[in-house]
UniProtKB/Swiss-Prot annotation:
Active site: 160, 365
E.C. numbers: 3.4.23.-
Biased composition (Acidic residues): 50-64
Coiled coil: none
Pfam family, one: TAXi_N
PANTHER family recorded: OS07G0603500 PROTEIN-RELATED, PROTEIN ASPARTIC PROTEASE IN GUARD CELL 1-LIKE
Protein name: Aspartyl protease family protein 2
Signal peptide: 1-23
Amino acid sequence: MVGRRKALLFSLCFFFLSLPSFSSLPSFQTLFPNSHSLPCASPVSFQPDSDSESLLESEFESGSDSESSSSITLNLDHIDALSSNKTPDELFSSRLQRDSRRVKSIATLAAQIPGRNVTHAPRPGGFSSSVVSGLSQGSGEYFTRLGVGTPARYVYMVLDTGSDIVWLQCAPCRRCYSQSDPIFDPRKSKTYATIPCSSPHCRRLDSAGCNTRRKTCLYQVSYGDGSFTVGDFSTETLTFRRNRVKGVALGCGHDNEGLFVGAAGLLGLGKGKLSFPGQTGHRFNQKFSYCLVDRSASSKPSSVVFGNAAVSRIARFTPLLSNPKLDTFYYVGLLGISVGGTRVPGVTASLFKLDQIGNGGVIIDSGTSVTRLIRPAYIAMRDAFRVGAKTLKRAPDFSLFDTCFDLSNMNEVKVPTVVLHFRGADVSLPATNYLIPVDTNGKFCFAFAGTMGGLSIIGNIQQQGFRVVYDLASSRVGFAPGGCA
């Protein structure tokens, strides 16, 4: 009797183990097309408040200091908010054009021989040589408001995980583009200081630049779209609400030209030592995170957090990978992709491998909008999605998107799920992160694209709704769903 029971239990166990796993079954989720449309250029969430800013200035003049705070939270707005005169269709078209330029520049940089890219911009008079820093891929997509100097003068700054330097326009200007706030004048700040040519900060720049008369450090950042900024490399106090961060090395640009219209400059969040996280690791424990909202369906602002509060308890982490060839970017290991609950055949870790000389790989980027995958992986993923979405009415291609659907007058539709399998972290995307509106007539497109190069990029559309955690102390990146609440 006992033997029969054991045999029966063994048979049942074998039967259940032989069944396909639940994850291999087709899986769908619901998209509500009528609830998602092209976002308008909504007003920025942090309109200048002269009273509070004046209060901060008076506090600092009297010697008050609030530098002890361990975490800082700031609102973020999309760069489209600075183009209030454009229609939703025009804004989306401009976004895709910016995205194409950025991806092209990153791909060009990644394809070069090992070593930092150097692009020379016009050399202004009085400069013995130029310092080239940062990467030639243009600015990011999100900006915040912060104070510069003492007393604090408030300006808008673009945040970008693909840049390694902090810089802003400074008076006097030889050439300056239009910005929404008065240009920062370092002569009116009590805490501004130039950096000697012999200092460690100056030596960390990609090449040595020195004003031979004043013996002070110079910097230059050149971008792939032809824009550039040149000026003095200096230190200054930055103010985030009521928190001061002293001695931040930044570029004070007196000669600037480019596409950074509206924002005063850029707060680099890359992996390099001169980025804002790189310089302030002792203050914020080498941790920061951001959460980017779906602007077509949420009135909440996006946000960025520096410090221990940046780390979500529910985040799933994947290790950061090192690439000396492009040490600014955050590389991760992508092992595969599932569509409709099933791993896409042929999309394996080998397609996304970062080789020994720095080619290939996958980066997480806040400034790229649409995720680009190496072409064989994209084609396999796209074809799997088309099969899973075969009941939806197809629509003509749109811009870089080759898989589009006519969802006009539809309240809800079932779409295949999409999961990105990183090393140690499976990230299940909401439907709104991969099937997005591209016009005001109900056309939705699969928001991925292929790339002919070897580098894949996880863009900010796919990051929406997740708190993306950069824990540099532990060399890892995490994803926490629902992190914008």
